[in-house]
Amino acid sequence: MRALSLHRDHAVDAASGLAFDEAMAQLAGLPELPQAHLRLYDYADHAVLVGRYQRLEDEVDLAMAIALGVTVNRRPTGGGAILMGADQLGVALAVPAGTFPTPRQGMSRFAQGVIAALASLGVKAEMRGKNDIEVAGKKIAGVGFCTSGDGLLFHASILADLDTDLLLSLLRIPLAKLAAHGTGAVEDRITTLAELGAGRAELEAALVASFCSQLGLGVVDGEGRDCLERRASVLAEQRYSSEAWLFAQGAAAAGELAVEVRSSQGTLRIIAATQGDVIKSAVVAGDFNEVTPELRSLEEALRWSVLEPGALGRVLAAAPGVSGLAAPEELAAALCDAHFGRMALAGPRRIGSCYIPEEITL
């Protein structure tokens, strides 16, 4: 069915909310359902959602979340940790996988759809980096994507308003580092619809018009919802209510290296198991959007490599695509420094999250 089905939801819980989004992607393009699905919604106060490839323990103060009754879950899409609630507008668009030449090009088009909607309200926004939409240098939204089944899912979280004190209390990186400067340090880096004088209802209408125009589809209300809810109920129980999903990236075990470095695809956290001065295995986590061939090449190159800066640097330089992520000699030095105990975390540290534009500090 050549149509865009519009779904509106309010105060959803994290597990069912994420499951419905993924169900839209899995069923996008089925002949008996609309070709695309657009969902505009918000979460019950409050939920922290980490990105697909992040390590939960690095991003969220779990003890504080439990104390405050804040739900924690993991998105199917990449990117950084976000706080969702009544004051954050969630946008999910699901289309068949072949709609765009590549998923990354699809995310760019999706971001442009959000930017066009903001522009129709007189808000001039632009894309910055891999995930950020900014207004006058301040972040107003983050975007991400994933593939699921034969569909593509695009996520955006748009700030209608924000409780910066709550944000600071829940997110470990980088907000704990900014806490010494007070909430003003956060507020200087973000903006909201409320601050810009833009109405949420008007933006929702503009988003519908923008994506219908972009995809060349007419809108229908809630078509196929029963089918989506049946699929979502299974995903909510089997995936989004599972601790295995929540802690999917795992923590570094005793004796393993844990090194955080900046790369062209975002912040990478390399976790390596060693035997003597040799890396037995390595896993890369982080706020990237997808596991690319370059990231897989990095993991493969690290396996059974000797932790000596010169030798490891040469191995990484020879690995396909690794030099495009970060300087091989810097990666090698970071791992060797951590291994030999000179630094607990080596290399550039991230000052940034899903709602804080990234900076680099040495």
What do these predicted ranges mean?
Residues M1-Q105:
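N-terminal lobe of the biotin/lipoate ligase/transferase fold
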Residues H37, G122-R128, E204, Q214-R231, ...:
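Flexible, glycine/charged-enriched surface loops at secondary-structure junctions
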Residues A86-N131:
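Contiguous, small/hydrophobic- and glycine-enriched helical/loop subdomains that border
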Residues M127-G144, R225-A236:
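Beta-rich nucleic-acid/ligand-interaction surfaces
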Residues K139-R200, R269, S281:
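A structural signal for small-residue-enriched, beta-sheet-centric alpha/beta enzyme cores
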Residues G182-G222, A232-E237:
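A conserved active-site cap/scaffold subdomain adjacent to cofactor or substrate pockets
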Residues I190, A273-Y355, I360-L362:
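Active-site- and interface-proximal helix/loop "cap" or "latch" segments in soluble metabolic
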Residues L228-G276:
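Structured beta-strand/loop patches that form or line metal/cofactor-binding pockets in enzymes
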